[in-house]
Regions:
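Active-site beta-strand/loop microenvironment that shapes enzyme catalytic pockets
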Residues: 1-17
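Reductase modules of NAD(P)H-dependent flavoproteins
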Residues: 19, 24-143
Length: 143
C-alpha cells in the first residue's frame, strides 16, 4: 500500500477491515507527507497497528523534515530487494494519491525494482508490469 498525504484514507479502511475480519497475511504501508510532527495522519492508530501485528511494516517519508526531500518512492527503492521478494510472493500493490508526480514516480520506482532486483530487461519489465495490472495486483486510485 502506497498512500502519501490524503492517499492514506483507503488504506486505513483496508487495515480496519482486516482487523474486523481477522484477516491474516503480511502487509506493508508506505506513507509520506511534508512534516512528521504536523502531517503524520493517524500516527497513533498506525503505530498501534504495527505494535499489535495488524500492520506488518510501516515505512514513512517526510519530505520537509531534513535538508533533502524524501518521498515514498525513495523508501521503496531503499527496500528494492524486499519489495521484489514481496512481489514474487504474490503481493498486491495499491497506490492512492497525487496523479501528477507521485503516481508516476512510484510507477518508475516499481519498474526500477523489477530491473534491479529481478534482473529484468526493459521488455521483460513491461511484460511484468502488464501482468501485475492484468492480474489486478497493481491498482491505482490517483487524482
Amino acid at each position: 500500500m502506497i498512500g502519501p498525504g490524503t492517499g492514506i484514507a483507503p488504506f486505513r479502511a483496508f487495515l480496519q477491515e482486516r482487523q474486523a475480519t481477522g484477516a491474516q497475511g503480511p502487509n506493508w504501508l508506505f506513507f509520506g507527507e511534508q512534516r512528521a510532527d504536523s502531517d503524520f495522519y493517524y500516527k497513533d492508530e498506525l503505530s498501534q497497528m504495527v505494535k499489535n501485528g495488524l500492520l506488518t511494516r510501516l515505512d514513512t517519508a517526510f519530505s520537509r523534515d531534513q535538508d533533502h526531500k524524501i518521498y515514498v518512492q525513495q523508501r521503496m527503492l531503499e527496500n528494492t530487494g524486499q519489495v521484489w521478494d514481496w512481489l514474487q510472493n504474490g503481493a498486491h500493490v495499491y497506490v492512492c494519491g497525487d496523479a501528477k508526480r507521485m503516481a508516476k514516480d512510484v510507477d518508475n520506482a516499481l519498474r526500477k525494482i523489477c530491473q534491479t532486483a529481478g534482473n529484468l530487461s526493459d521488455d521483460q519489465t513491461e511484460e511484468y508490469m502488464a501482468a501485475l495490472r492484468r492480474d489486478k495486483r497493481y491498482q491505482r486510485d490517483v487524482y
